């Protein structure tokens, strides 16, 4: 698989208070493509960030119902991947921020 497909597979990192606490345990969370599988996510993370992945957990997140100007709508469904890295590896999302 080419590196372009890896970048299409991993949408963006999920940066919240909960995921920040998980990163201390070497667990990082990403939104991934709806058709992504564990093995493909593992290969993509290893190729993009040059780290060693220990385990991948996949979650399907259902979209919430929302109201906008009196019209009831729904957010899109998403897929999240929680990636556990090996002990000596980490990902620095805020590397250039000072």
UniProtKB/Swiss-Prot annotation:
<dbReference type="Pfam" id="PF00276">
    <property type="entry name" value="Ribosomal_L23"/>
</dbReference>
<keyword id="KW-0694">RNA-binding</keyword>
<dbReference type="InterPro" id="IPR012678">
    <property type="entry name" value="Ribosomal_uL23/eL15/eS24_sf"/>
</dbReference>
<dbReference type="GO" id="GO:0003735">
    <property type="term" value="F:structural constituent of ribosome"/>
</dbReference>
<dbReference type="GO" id="GO:0019843">
    <property type="term" value="F:rRNA binding"/>
</dbReference>
<dbReference type="GO" id="GO:1990904">
    <property type="term" value="C:ribonucleoprotein complex"/>
</dbReference>
<dbReference type="GO" id="GO:0005840">
    <property type="term" value="C:ribosome"/>
</dbReference>
<keyword id="KW-0689">Ribosomal protein</keyword>
<dbReference type="InterPro" id="IPR013025">
    <property type="entry name" value="Ribosomal_uL23-like"/>
</dbReference>
<keyword id="KW-0699">rRNA-binding</keyword>
<dbReference type="InterPro" id="IPR012677">
    <property type="entry name" value="Nucleotide-bd_a/b_plait_sf"/>
</dbReference>
<protein>
    <recommendedName>
        <fullName>Large ribosomal subunit protein uL23</fullName>
    </recommendedName>
</protein>
<comment type="similarity">
    <text>Belongs to the universal ribosomal protein uL23 family.</text>
</comment>
<keyword id="KW-0687">Ribonucleoprotein</keyword>
<comment type="function">
    <text>One of the early assembly proteins it binds 23S rRNA. One of the proteins that surrounds the polypeptide exit tunnel on the outside of the ribosome. Forms the main docking site for trigger factor binding to the ribosome.</text>
</comment>
<comment type="subunit">
    <text>Part of the 50S ribosomal subunit. Contacts protein L29, and trigger factor when it is bound to the ribosome.</text>
</comment>
<dbReference type="GO" id="GO:0006412">
    <property type="term" value="P:translation"/>
</dbReference>
């Amino acid at each position: 698989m080419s590196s372009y497909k890896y970048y299409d597979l991993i949408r963006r990192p999920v940066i919240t208070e909960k995921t920040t606490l998980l990163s201390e345990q070497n667990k990082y969370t990403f939104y991934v493509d709806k058709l992504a599988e564990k093995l493909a996510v593992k290969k993509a993370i290893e190729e993009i960030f040059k780290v060693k992945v220990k385990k991948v957990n996949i979650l399907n997140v259902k979209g919430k119902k929302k109201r906008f100007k009196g019209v009831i709508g729904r957010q899109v469904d998403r897929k999240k991947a929680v990636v556990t890295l090996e002990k000596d590896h980490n990902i620095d999302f805020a590397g250039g921020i000072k």
